[in-house]
Amino acid sequence: MQALLFISCGAILGASLRWAIGLLFNPLFSSFAFGTLIANLFGCLIIGVLLGLFWQFPQISSEWRLFLITGFLGSLTTFSSFSSEVVELFFNDKWLNGFCVLMMHLFGCLAMTVLGIWIYKICSQLLS
């Protein structure tokens, strides 16, 4: 039951941030939901940093992992919104837009995760 509390608290914060990002960034482009891309890229950057942290300090409690990764990042990032937005572009015969959004999410998120790990490693070395 305690694990559910940690996940839920993280999810409240992650979902709130995702909603705010959508409000701020979605109006910028009419061709696709820019807020979803920003939320996913930011979430992947943060998970990269957290992966580096958890790899270096495996003794960090599972509660923090549940709060940050499962709760916060799980609700901040959104595969279902990304999927529905790409499918909608395809169904509206906006094939190029759909493919571009698909590639931005896929490769952008992978790159941001790697960047997050590198950022953690560099900061860790500078601070030690």
From Swiss-Prot:
Principal location: membrane
Compartments (UniProt record): Cell inner membrane
Cited Pfam families: CRCB
Residues engaged in binding Na(+): G74, T77
Entry GO MF terms: fluoride channel activity; metal ion binding
InterPro entries assigned to the protein according to its UniProt record, in alphabetical order: FluC
Membrane association type: Multi-pass membrane protein
Record-level GO cellular component terms: plasma membrane
Keyword presence, Hydrolase: no
Keywords, ordered alphabetically: Cell inner membrane, Cell membrane, Ion channel, Ion transport, Membrane, Metal-binding, Sodium, Transmembrane, Transmembrane helix, Transport
Ranges annotated as spanning the membrane: 5-25, 34-54, 67-87, 99-119
Gene Ontology process terms (BP): cellular detoxification of fluoride
Catalytic activity: fluoride(in) = fluoride(out)
Taxonomy, superkingdom: Bacteria
Activity control summary: Na(+) is not transported, but it plays an essential structural role and its presence is essential for fluoride channel function.
Function description: Fluoride-specific ion channel. Important for reducing fluoride concentration in the cell, thus reducing its toxicity.
PANTHER family in alphabetical order: FLUORIDE EXPORT PROTEIN 1-RELATED
Family: Belongs to the fluoride channel Fluc/FEX (TC 1.A.43) family.
Protein name: Fluoride-specific ion channel FluC
Biological classification of the source: Bacteria, Pseudomonadati, Pseudomonadota, Gammaproteobacteria, Pasteurellales
